[in-house]
Structures are given as C-alpha cells and as structure tokens.
Amino acid sequence: MPENLAKAIANPLFPALDSLLRAGRHVSSDDLDNHAFLSDFEPDLALFYQRYHTELVRAPEGFFYLRPRSTSLINRSVLSELDMLVGKVLCFLYLSPERLAHEGIFTNQELYDELLTLVEEKKLMKLVTNRASGSDLDREKLFEKVRTSLRRLRRLGMVITIGDTGKFRITEAVFRFGADVRLGGDVREAQLRLIRDGEAVVHTPEPSQQSLLENPTAEYDEEQTEWEDEA
C-alpha cells in the first residue's frame, strides 16, 4: 500500500468520512476538517476508491463526492421526483441575490413559497395526490413532503440546518442539480428553465438500497431517479 494512502486510512477522520461518502454525502468547504483531509489526500483516495469501481470527484465548485460506475461495488442512490425538484430550486436560490442579502440563510417557508412560484401547482399536487388540484389538507401534505426532501438533501450535504429554527444554509453542493447550466450565459435563467422544463433521461431500475448518488444531469420518472454520469 502506498505510504500516503496508508496515512490517509490511518487518519482518525477516515472511518466516519468514508461511511458518509459511501452513503452519498457531499463534502463542501463548510465541513472544514473533512474537506481539508480530502484535499490533502485526494490523489491517494482516488486510487483507493477506484478499487471499488467508484470515482472520487472534486467538482468545479470545490466539493467532493463519490460517483459509482456501472460496475461499482458500492450501491447507487435514488431520489424522488420531488427531491430532485427541491434540489433544483435550492440551486436557483443559491444563485439568487437574496442569498447574499440573507447571508445565505433561508427558511423552510421561503423554500416552499419559491417552489410554488417556480412550479405549476398542478404539477406539485400530482406528486402528492396524483391529481392536478388539491385541498388545503393536500397543500399541508405537500409542505411536509418538501420538508422531508429537505431533510434528505441535508443528509447528502446540500444544506446545513441552523438549530431548530426552521432555517438552513445552502452549500455549493447544490450545483449537483445545476451541472448542465454552468456553460456561460445567464445561469440563473438557465436554472429556471431547468426547473420548469426539465432535461431528461428516465431510469426504471430500482437499486436495493440507498447509498451513493450519481449525477443529476437527468430528469426523473414519477417514482425514482438514478443520478447519471456528468457530461
């Protein structure tokens, strides 16, 4: 085993970080110790994960994550359609002037209101009721589902919650949901089109368990979506 890789594996940070990465966590610069560790040992750990047919990726925005290949020994993860939609809206908010004005902090209600502003209500209602319209109770159910999606994305490192206040801060890892709008032009307008129109490759296989995310350059089917390789 190469000396640097042995040092990396022997580091007390490695066991927990390895488990997080395998569970789909994205490590952004907000996670100071883990991000510095990955930066220091990136080439060595990249070789380590290659043994599992998995790539350690450092995105252009600086965050790290694992991307499994088709032959990976580590399982992929799936996200629901609503998870993907919430992620895209989070990316839109990250690009917004409001993020700077609010010091990067948003509330659950602000996310929900932005979602209703950007996406037709009938499309959102179909995610909850399979109908194009809904009652006040259905809207409450939608709000709870949005909160559930936000909690799932928090576990993946997309947002950082602030106590029990219903507030959160968005990390640069949300660019996993905006990877196809980084090529010049008005990125915020392009992200808005991505939210409203979608750009799709539909998948139907259902992995046996949730662990690693692939890339969200793809739209989704009604139930589950597998993240595809980056362009």
Curated annotation (Swiss-Prot):
Keywords: Cell cycle, Cell division, Chromosome partition, Cytoplasm, DNA condensation
Pfam families: MukE
Acidic residues composition bias: residue spans: 219-231
Primary localisation category: cytoplasm
NAD found in the keyword field: no
Cellular component annotations (GO), alphabetically ordered: cytoplasm; nucleoid
InterPro entries: MukE_C, MukE_N, Scp_MukE
Region (Disordered): 204-231
Keyword Cell division: yes
Entry superkingdom: Bacteria
Localization of this protein: Cytoplasm, Nucleoid
One biological process term in Gene Ontology: cell division
Similarity annotation: Belongs to the MukE family.
Subunit annotation: Interacts, and probably forms a ternary complex, with MukF and MukB. The complex formation is stimulated by calcium or magnesium.
Matches recorded under HAMAP family: MukE (MF_01802)
Function according to Swiss-Prot or TrEMBL: Involved in chromosome condensation, segregation and cell cycle progression. May participate in facilitating chromosome segregation by condensation DNA from both sides of a centrally located replisome during cell division. Probably acts via its interaction with MukB and MukF.
NCBIfam families membership: PRK05256.1
Identification of the protein by name: Chromosome partition protein MukE
